[in-house]
Amino acid sequence: MGRFISVSFGLLVVFLSLSGTGADFDCPSDWVSYDQHCYKAFNDLKNWTDAEKFCTEQNKGSHLVSLHSSEEEDFVVNLASQSLQYPVAWIGLGNMWKECRSEWSDGGNVKYKALAEESYCLLINTHKKGWRSMTCNNMAHVICKF
């Protein structure tokens, strides 16, 4: 009896070590999981607005990818560089000037429409780590996350 319990306990330990913490995150088969979120890079080229809409149609709670750490950015860059034809993809920061409140050094409000006619959104470059701005109407790949 003692040997049975010992073997059973040993098998339980092996099972738990192979299965991780028990908090694994299940993603659809064509999505990749990282830190309890699911990601997918699409080769479709879309402007920022259409890319965000596209992501929301892919899965419940899905949006353009948001990046909350350097490690997450590394993961996304690696995923994108393996999947995408071109090295740029939209991230979930769009129309940067829309909600910004800024003022000149003399206290006057900045009128962004005088600065640029087009809105600027952010994308990630898979060849160079970091975010870049580009007009939201340009085309780039799509990376979704939920």
From Swiss-Prot:
Stretches of the chain forming a coiled coil according to its record: none
Any one GO molecular-function label of the UniProt entry: toxin activity
Subcellular location: Secreted
Domain of life: Eukaryota
Gene3D superfamilies: Mannose-Binding Protein A, subunit A
Record's keyword terms, sorted: Blood coagulation cascade activating toxin, Calcium, Disulfide bond, Glycoprotein, Hemostasis impairing toxin, Metal-binding, Secreted, Signal, Toxin
Glycosylation sites: 47
Role, per record: Regulatory subunit of the blood coagulation factor X-activating enzyme. Activates coagulation factor X (F10) by cleaving the Arg-Ile bond at position 234, activates coagulation factor IX (F9) by cleaving the Arg-Val bond at position 226 and is also able to activate protein C (PROC). May serve as an exosite by which the enzyme recognizes and binds to the Gla domain of factor X (F10) in a calcium-dependent manner.
Further facts: Calcium is required for ligand binding.
Subunit comment: Heterotrimer; disulfide-linked. The heterotrimer consists of 1 heavy chain (a metalloproteinase) and 2 light chains: LC1 and LC2.
Similarity comment: family membership: Belongs to the snaclec family.
Protein name: Snaclec coagulation factor X-activating enzyme light chain 1
Species, as recorded: Macrovipera lebetinus (Levantine viper)
Chain's gene name: LC1
